[in-house]
Amino acid sequence: MLIIETLPMLRREVRRWRQDGKRVALVPTMGNLHDGHMTLVDEARERADIVIVSIFVNPMQFERADDLARYPRTLQEDCEKLNRRGVDLVFSPAPADIYPHGVDGQTFVDVPSLSTLLEGASRPGHFRGVSTIVSKLFNLVQPDLACFGEKDYQQLALIRKMVADMGYDIDIIGVPTVRAKDGLALSSRNGYLTAEERKIAPLLSKVMQQIAERLGQGERHVEEMMISAENTLAENGLRADGLAIVDADTLLPLNVDSQRAVILMAAWLGKARLIDNQQVDLTQ
């Protein structure tokens, strides 16, 4: 497995594989890899000849400097996991290589509406950072396909829209969320939880499942369901930071024509911001 830090070396290797007619997959990450990331890698391996994993803690995605500073960096352990998984290349650039003029001097990519809706409203600039770095990685690697987790539902929707709008010839593969046995969605930020908080955290997915069951039974009292969910979370020490039940295709409020809903949930538990989502078929 190659570990590359510079843009010219990355381009050289990608060019070589391209000349050999290889199909290339990209898995963008910020490192601190867990089993959810490995599922993305496995999906990429099934679909391509060459798997490239990027590890870059993107400063443009962080609103607070202290959050950026404490994000776990575990490059050596990550590379060992990826090597065992049969990854061909790890691209781990320094911020100065990605943003030579600094974040403030960087040309950015913005996806209208999806960047400021829902999760974007509570995290200004976050999705601009996502779309900018993903676009840059797409330009550098020029993959045939890229794999993203469905846990970050709005991010996946935003990337798909960006790819369509910008004319990228890249297949975007959404991979189902990987969960612990108690239902908690795997996340790098779960490491921020104390032992006691970890016992409480699965409540987020349980509340989400309760909403899904009510929607599946034909209930459409969205506001009442969200208030009830927020109260249940608060009673157990979770502070809601974005609860929504919206059309799964548009991320806009449900209407009579909506065929699928998605429940989007975000909540703080101690120092960890947990997110999760679940899609619901409304046609049955």
Curated annotation (Swiss-Prot):
The keyword Cytoplasm applies. GO terms for biological process: pantothenate biosynthetic process. SUPFAM superfamilies: Nucleotidylyl transferase. Belongs to the pantothenate synthetase family. It comes from Erwinia tasmaniensis (strain DSM 17950 / CFBP 7177 / CIP 109463 / NCPPB 4357 / Et1/99). Keywords: ATP-binding, Cytoplasm, Ligase, Nucleotide-binding, Pantothenate biosynthesis. ATP binds at residues 30-37, 149-152, 178, 186-189. The gene is panC. (R)-pantoate binds at Q61, Q155. This is Pantothenate synthetase. It is found in: Cytoplasm. PANTHER family: CYTIDYLATE KINASE/PANTOATE-BETA-ALANINE LIGASE, PANTOATE--BETA-ALANINE LIGASE. Homodimer. The keyword Disulfide bond does not apply. Beta-alanine binds at Q61. Its main location: cytoplasm.
